[in-house]
């Protein structure tokens, strides 16, 4: 874990300042606010780097979000401008249009949306929403990616959904390191220690992954792990999900 979290936090804030000075000196940072630790910490870092007036939080429930009050508490505590966009109607309209599409049943053999499509479509709609909001801001915007290094390592994200963005402050920090940074920021501590979940299944991230972030973090940082089955699963997830972090392959004639 971080030996000097204070200096890492200061370096992160400066990194965000430097990114914007080179890639949009007057732009705002647009951050999707879920009410979890990662988006809260990214928003707080952006506020410290750019000032509250240049950070726009976007809350994007899909219909009813059980922890929407946490997301509202984040933007209220940070004092940043925010927009609430309920993507429920867009999700319903898109999935219905797909199901009713000419040839859908013939080609897919289905009359509904698959579980994977149901899980991954909302994050992609949210990323579309963030870019649309950004392009409506007076001075433009850059969209924050809020994934952390532990999630990235095992591919616990949606390609072109929450894995997208313009800049990624937490990509090289594992979960416990992110929490170390969070404890140094002016944010509610219960959000820093909040159990990560997808907000869909009622299960925590760790329940779905089959191992704890503590085990994963240690393995990423030291290569040490006790359970060979857990090591095999982590290695497998890392291998099959590498494409999410790589540029699209292209043919060179």
Which residue ranges define each predicted feature?
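Extended, folded domain segments that form the structural surfaces/walls around functional sites
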Residues: 39, 60-61
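ATP/NTP-dependent adenylation/nucleotidyl-transfer catalytic domains that generate, transfer
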Residues: 1-31, 45-48, 53-56, 62-63, ...
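Short, surface-exposed alpha-helical segments at coil->helix boundaries
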Residues: 39, 43, 68-72
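Conserved G/P- and acidic residue-centered "switch" motifs that form tight phosphate/ATP-binding loops
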Residues: 36
């Amino acid at each position: 874990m971080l030996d000097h979290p204070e200096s890492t936090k200061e370096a992160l804030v400066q990194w965000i300042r430097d990114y914007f000075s080179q890639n949009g000196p007057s732009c705002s940072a647009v951050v999707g606010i879920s009410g979890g630790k990662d988006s809260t910490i990214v928003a707080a870092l952006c506020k410290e780097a750019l000032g509250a007036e240049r950070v726009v939080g976007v809350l994007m429930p899909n219909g009813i979000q059980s922890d929407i009050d946490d997301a509202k508490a984040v933007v209220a505590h940070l004092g940043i401008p925010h927009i609430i966009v309920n993507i429920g109607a867009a999700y319903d309209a898109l999935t219905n249009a797909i199901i009713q599409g000419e040839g859908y049943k013939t080609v897919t053999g289905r009359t509904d949306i698959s579980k994977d499509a149901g899980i991954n479509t909302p994050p992609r709609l949210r990323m579309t929403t963030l870019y649309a909001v950004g392009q409506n801001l007076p001075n433009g915007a850059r969209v924050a990616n809020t994934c952390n290094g532990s999630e990235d390592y095992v591919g616990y994200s949606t390609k072109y959904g929450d894995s997208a963005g313009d800049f990624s402050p937490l990509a090289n920090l594992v979960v416990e390191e992110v929490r170390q940074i969070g404890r140094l920021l002016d944010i509610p501590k219960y959000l820093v220690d909040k159990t990560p979940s997808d907000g869909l299944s009622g299960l925590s991230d760790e329940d779905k992954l089959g191992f704890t972030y503590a085990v994963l973090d240690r393995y990423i940082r030291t290569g040490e792990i006790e359970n060979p089955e857990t090591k095999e699963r982590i290695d497998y997830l890392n291998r099959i999900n590498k494409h999410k972090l790589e540029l699209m392959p292209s043919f060179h004639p």
